């Protein structure tokens, strides 16, 4: 990447939409909407600033290895990734939700999650789930899934799930209920550590603008 150019890694969906006001605060406007375009590289109103559209779980990897100078990733993704090689200057307070344990209605979670007990947990977030239950002294068999998490307890694949919950409507519609809060999740600004040094003059005004926009909410 050129020293006078910046690449920003973003994912489609809620994070992208809630990032637009932050970009605007820094004077950055995308030339296209990723939901309407098949392009994975999108220009902006600045010739030297571009966006790359990647999977949410890949944002830290693109930033860590310098394919992007900075990006926006959920705390859940960063915990699973480990955050190696990343500078995390700001909680942007967007895409807020909660990481929760959920079970089918009628399941006695309190009794089943006592120290020394064993549970089968289905989740996209094995690191978060394993750490949480280890802290409780509960033995767990982690079943990694990539979607339709709510199905797992209903068909006997797992006793419980660990997943992101926003409104809880999906859980309710599938006969599940949230029974334990693990951690609050929001999205963070992540910056490549090398880029922070070599492109400081370009990055610092954007970081400051993002910070100002967050405080102004």
Swiss-Prot record:
Protein's name according to its UniProt entry: ATP phosphoribosyltransferase
Reaction catalysed by this enzyme: 1-(5-phospho-beta-D-ribosyl)-ATP + diphosphate = 5-phospho-alpha-D-ribose 1-diphosphate + ATP
One Pfam family in the UniProt entry: HisG
Recorded domain comment: Lacks the C-terminal regulatory region which is replaced by HisZ.
Organism name: Neisseria meningitidis serogroup B (strain ATCC BAA-335 / MC58)
Function: Catalyzes the condensation of ATP and 5-phosphoribose 1-diphosphate to form N'-(5'-phosphoribosyl)-ATP (PR-ATP). Has a crucial role in the pathway because the rate of histidine biosynthesis seems to be controlled primarily by regulation of HisG enzymatic activity.
Single GO MF annotation: ATP phosphoribosyltransferase activity
Entry keywords, A to Z: Amino-acid biosynthesis, ATP-binding, Cytoplasm, Glycosyltransferase, Histidine biosynthesis, Nucleotide-binding, Transferase
């Amino acid at each position: 990447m050129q020293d006078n150019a910046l690449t920003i890694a973003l994912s489609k969906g809620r994070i992208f939409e809630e990032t637009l006001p932050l970009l605007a605060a820094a004077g950055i406007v995308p030339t296209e909407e990723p939901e309407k375009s098949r392009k994975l590289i999108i220009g902006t109103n600045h010739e030297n600033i571009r966006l790359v559209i990647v999977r949410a779980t890949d944002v830290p990897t693109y930033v860590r290895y310098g394919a992007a100078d900075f990006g926006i990733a959920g705390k859940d993704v960063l915990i699973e990734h480990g955050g190696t090689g990343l500078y995390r200057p700001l909680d942007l307070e967007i895409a807020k939700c909660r990481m929760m344990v959920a079970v089918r209605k009628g399941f006695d979670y309190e009794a089943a999650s006592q120290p020394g007990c064993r549970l089968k947990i289905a989740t996209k977030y094995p690191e978060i789930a394993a750490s949480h239950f280890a802290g409780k002294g509960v033995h767990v068999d982690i079943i990694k899934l990539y979607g339709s998490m709510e199905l797992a307890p209903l068909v006997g694949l797992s006793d419980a799930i660990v997943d992101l919950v926003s409104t809880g409507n999906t859980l309710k519609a599938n006969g599940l209920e949230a029974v334990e809060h693990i951690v609050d999740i929001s999205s963070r600004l992540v910056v490549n550590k090398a880029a922070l040094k070599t492109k400081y003059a370009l990055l610092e005004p954007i970081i400051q603008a993002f910070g100002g926009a967050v405080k102004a909410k």
